[in-house]
Amino acid sequence: MDLDDIDMTVQEILTEMKDKSEVIVDLAYASLMYNSRDMVEKVRKIQDEMEDLKYAVRVKVIMAARTKEEAKQLSGILQIATAADRIARSAGDIAQLID
């Protein structure tokens, strides 16, 4: 992924990740309920998007930290991004039950 493609702030990226994590859980559940392979594909697409967003957050946070103290303060942001990514991966695991 090219970071030039993502011109959002870290806050905007985290908000996007939160929104996508909500959608992906709903899609994964619906894919099971309706036995829908189309929904499984949408889950996979969102998973890929979440990976890109997580990467963008990591790079932006690393670039923002100038001192050890700032790095410690920014580590929480990385934990939030990782948590959203875990939600997406777990939803992907649920959707894989269809395959």
Show which residues each predicted segment covers.
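Cytosolic, long alpha-helical scaffolding segments
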Residues: 1-99
